């Protein structure tokens, strides 16, 4: 079991001089302060033993995180932030490896349960608090054929939005540029089917992927003002991709 604590404080002064249509110079200054604090407790257990001429591994992980996010700016050109996140994640996995002649097989299954509570000004926001339950199977087949080596794998992984991406407040960069998080983001899951072939110095790799709910930063007008832009992460529609590489 491990315990981790991390804090980050950042003060920033933004001074701007803008020449208006009347050729008059307008000076402005904004002073911001951000204070993030994190505490994490994590534990992991893995057991391995032989089974049916192969090797079986089973295990589990648990983590609990508390994060506090404070942001103030003077003058108050955007709203101040007082946000808190409480998150716990529990996972269990099983993995089995065995050879059948020249064929090597590795199969696994992982389960993850995530409980995410979101608070603004010490009030839990039910709409932005979520639970997730995911299964991630995996399979790898490796086979040497003469002087060649072939491998076929299937695996799935998950990208969970960072806490910075999940914040609800708006950060002031300058009078024309703002950025924010999006507490309604959902995790993105990528499922990959990969074929690899190698012969002497030649390596071929083909990857077919299905990406669900990828997180991308989108830019839009801020407060219906076309000269002000807001950068905000969003989930985009699911899509398929194909990659090929030859070296």
Q: Which residues does each predicted region cover?
A:
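Outer-membrane beta-barrel signature, preferentially recognizing the C-terminal barrel domain
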Residues: 36, 84-87, 127-130, 158-212, ...
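Outer-membrane beta-barrel channel domains
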Residues: 41, 50, 118, 135, ...
């Amino acid at each position: 079991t491990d315990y981790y604590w991390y804090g980050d404080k950042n003060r920033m002064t933004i001074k701007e001089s803008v020449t208006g249509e009347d050729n008059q110079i307008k000076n402005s200054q904004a002073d911001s302060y951000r204070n993030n604090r994190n505490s994490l407790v994590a534990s992991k257990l893995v057991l391995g033993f032989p089974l049916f001429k192969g090797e079986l591994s089973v295990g589990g992980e648990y983590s609990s995180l508390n994060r506090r996010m404070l942001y103030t700016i003077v003058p108050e050109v955007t709203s101040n932030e007082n946000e808190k996140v409480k998150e716990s994640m529990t996972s269990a996995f099983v993995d089995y490896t065995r050879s059948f002649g020249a064929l090597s097989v590795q199969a696994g299954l992982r389960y993850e349960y995530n409980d995410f509570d979101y608070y603004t000004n010490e009030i839990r926001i039910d709409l932005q608090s979520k639970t997730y339950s995911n299964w991630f199977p995996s399979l790898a087949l490796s086979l040497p054929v003469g002087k060649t080596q072939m491998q076929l794998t299937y695996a799935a992984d998950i990208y969970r939005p960072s806490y910075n991406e999940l914040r609800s407040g708006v950060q002031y960069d300058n009078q024309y540029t703002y950025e924010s998080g999006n507490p309604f983001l959902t995790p993105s899951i990528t499922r990959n089917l990969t074929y690899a072939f190698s012969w002497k110095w030649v390596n071929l790799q083909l990857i077919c992927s299905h990406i669900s709910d990828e997180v991308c930063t989108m830019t839009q007008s801020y407060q219906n003002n076309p000269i002000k832009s807001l950068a905000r992460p969003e989930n985009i529609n699911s899509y398929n991709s194909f990659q090929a590489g030859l070296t």
